From Swiss-Prot:
Chain residues in the propeptide: 326-349
Family the entry assigns: Belongs to the early nodulin-like (ENODL) family.
Entry protein name: Early nodulin-like protein 2
Gene it is expressed from: ENODL2
Signal peptide: 1-28
Amino acid sequence: MTFLKMKSLSFFFTILLSLSTLFTISNARKFNVGGSGAWVTNPPENYESWSGKNRFLVHDTLYFSYAKGADSVLEVNKADYDACNTKNPIKRVDDGDSEISLDRYGPFYFISGNEDNCKKGQKLNVVVISARIPSTAQSPHAAAPGSSTPGSMTPPGGAHSPKSSSPVSPTTSPPGSTTPPGGAHSPKSSSAVSPATSPPGSMAPKSGSPVSPTTSPPAPPKSTSPVSPSSAPMTSPPAPMAPKSSSTIPPSSAPMTSPPGSMAPKSSSPVSNSPTVSPSLAPGGSTSSSPSDSPSGSAMGPSGDGPSAAGDISTPAGAPGQKKSSANGMTVMSITTVLSLVLTIFLSA
């Protein structure tokens, strides 16, 4: 069975090859040398110029007409063509009406069998080109004008930097020092901040969470350095030292007393309800950082609509109530779930 299939395929390809050969031969053209076919000395049109005006393909034929016995046509190589050497021709015809087939592509060189006639210009140079099949398929790498290759999109402008996981909160500092820079975007803290006591000139943020009553110590001597809301940190002098607050303070609704002259910036973002303790500045001018409720993208600065100086800061006392409401909600949900289970068991019984 396989042999029969192979035989059929061979026969089919043989037929195709024969048809293509016949089609090529049928398209072959016959050229009269010099336009008239006359193979003579001093032709009306130079053979070289005539050859340059025509396009020769494989299987085309050249027709030479001359007096039989008096002349001939020799096919030679280029060196013999230039020197009109008739002693070692590649092919020779002398029947008077000769047709020579151009069976390959490339140059062909023909001269007269009479050396004197060759020197008088009776020679012909023909260049056969290979037939090209016109290609209709477009190159896959060709790109349309104005089009661009797909690539990655460039993000617009300055992309926001990722939110910092350790933002800086305002802490107690001696007179003349400022808070550390808060230029990075800081996420909203998951715990409320209880700012420590501040001597005069320090910045005390307004907290949205319950704080415990804290009394600031007597004001130390006034520093000669003005307080600036700038985000650039400054080294504080080692002499004044702020009291250290280290104990965990329970939430309450009592106000916090701020020393005269302190500024309270207004927080622009809400904070959550778990109080934590913010460590104060260590001796020697070093600053400490803790999670805070500072707004993202800028350092803390005094606000015009915040509480005035030398006044009590009242803080909302809604956090314990919210915790109590959450506990009540959890209790109600638990009771509802138990009742639903009991009702389901009762109905299924």
